[in-house]
Design a protein with these regions (language model features):
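Beta-alpha junction/loop-to-helix N-cap segments that form part of ligand/metal-binding clefts
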Residues: 28, 43-49, 64-148, 160, ...
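Extracytoplasmic ligand/sensor domains, especially the bilobed periplasmic-binding protein
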Residues: 105-218, 267-293
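Segments of small-molecule ligand-sensing domains
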Residues: 316-330, 341-404
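Extracellular/periplasmic periplasmic-binding protein-like sensory domains
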Residues: 259-334, 345-346, 404-413, 418-424
Length: 425
């Protein structure tokens, strides 16, 4: 019996000598990451799933090395509800503030997602000296306009998700490509009553008119609108040859169904929130056919190879959750924890100011392209070359599949005109 106890003692001692960091990682406190997320919304669910996947991968590999010790990540998720109709900004801010104070977090990653809430939240982070990395939504150009005017005050804030200032030039380029190919030049614009939607409308109008388009109609509809038949009749009457849409709400799916049922002779192109979901073909009975959807940050569509990390992310997500990733928010949310891991391990520190400097200096390959930040406003840089920037993506529903058609460097197929639409050429 004594001999057996001695052998066990020797084995345990050997484990301490050979695997000291492994043993330490089992006993140290986790690194707490506060995650403000609108959990009822599609985008919030995208972000939450991808953050959980990254956390599980990092923890399975031993955690994050802080000096000589590896520590696991723990996500403290709070439901901000900012994508739900009627939830005031004050309640969203209160949820974030409560997370900071109750859980003593020094790093936040996630949302808010709604642009108005995201802008208001910027003033919380310098107050409490906590890092915030927005990786779900908040597509308003107002965010980087505000941080860029006073980066010394807003130094704790970073945005890993993209914004319409990046998205729209890509979309306008696609629109002009379609214009030249098919001879179209008349456009109708419809958007939801939200800051980033109206900013998208203004930017598309400006870019398209410069490219030779004529805007034959414009409409802004309230959030949660479900009947678009009157607007679509106006589209038909206007002679529009393209219908540009920007509406992030789940209710916007009704517009696509009605567009298809009414066979509106104008291809639908833009951002219709739920239609990036891989279940949409089945759910709508194929009524999303030929819709061109801006699908957020690149890296979530079948067959993409933006970088060597794109397919591993896609496959890991599908294995973990049983579905292909949707679009908006997924890749930034997966990337954000690897970004933090990189910054913490480079500095060996969890000091907030030290990490701010490290995040500013980030230059890493992600599932969505090359990740770097603009040091003047802390916005992650997006473009059209994955060797230099993060990537956007546009898909078209073709024969039940989500096909990436733009930007050209990551496209897996070409745009197809709906069969009921006639080209002047």
């Amino acid at each position: 019996m004594k001999k057996k106890a001695l052998i066990l003692f020797i084995m345990a001692s050997a484990a301490l000598i050979i695997y000291p960091n492994y043993v330490k990682s089992q006993t140290v406190e986790p690194i707490i990451i506060g995650a403000p997320i609108p959990r009822a919304s599609t985008y919030g669910q995208n972000g939450e799933r991808s953050m959980i996947l990254a956390m599980e991968e990092i923890n399975a590999a031993g955690g994050i090395r802080v000096g000589t010790v590896k520590r696991p990540i723990k996500l403290e998720i709070v439901d901000t509800r900012d994508e739900e109709p009627g939830v005031p900004t004050s309640e969203v801010l209160l949820a974030i503030e409560k997370l900071i104070l109750d859980k003593k977090v020094k790093i936040l990653a996630g949302g808010p997602c709604m642009s108005e809430c995201c802008l208001a939240a910027l003033d919380l982070y310098p107050k409490y000296k906590v890092i915030s990395i927005v990786n779900i939504g908040c597509w308003t150009p107002g965010w980087h306009a505000k941080t860029g005017k006073d980066i010394a005050t807003y130094k704790y804030s970073f945005r890993l998700s993209g914004n319409v200032a990046y998205w729209i030039p890509n979309i306008v380029t696609l629109l002009n490509n379609i214009k030249e190919k098919y001879g179209f030049n008349k456009m109708y614009i419809t958007v939801a009553e939200a800051a980033h939607c109206k900013a998208a409308a203004a930017a598309v109008e400006k870019g398209s008119v410069a490219g030779g388009w004529t805007i034959v109609g414009k409409e802004v509809h309230p959030l949660a609108t479900t009947d678009f038949s009157m607007m679509l009749r106006d589209v038909r009457k206007s002679g529009a040859q393209v219908l540009f849409i920007w509406d992030h709400t789940p209710e916007a799916l009704a517009m696509v169904n009605q567009w298809q049922d009414m066979k509106i002779p104008a291809p639908a192109i833009g951002f219709v929130g739920p239609t990036e979901d891989p279940v949409m073909w089945k759910q709508t009975g194929g009524k999303v056919a030929y819709l061109v959807e801006f699908a957020g940050e690149g890296g979530t569509l079948p067959g993409q190879e933006i970088t060597s990390l794109t397919k591993p992310f896609f496959n890991a997500f599908k294995k973990r959750w049983g579905d292909e990733p949707r679009g908006t928010g997924n890749v930034p949310s997966y990337t954000v924890l690897y970004l933090l891991k990189d910054a913490i391990e480079r500095t060996g520190s969890l000091d907030v100011d030290t990490l701010v400097t490290a995040i500013e200096q980030t230059d890493m390959i992600s599932a969505g392209g090359r990740l770097r930040f603009d040091k003047t406003n802390h916005q992650a840089i997006y473009g059209t070359d994955p060797k230099e920037t993060l990537m956007p993506q546009l898909l078209q529903w073709q024969d039940g599949k989500r096909v990436c058609i733009w930007p050209s460097k990551i496209a897996s197929g070409e745009y197809k005109l709906p069969p009921w639409v006639k080209s002047p050429k």
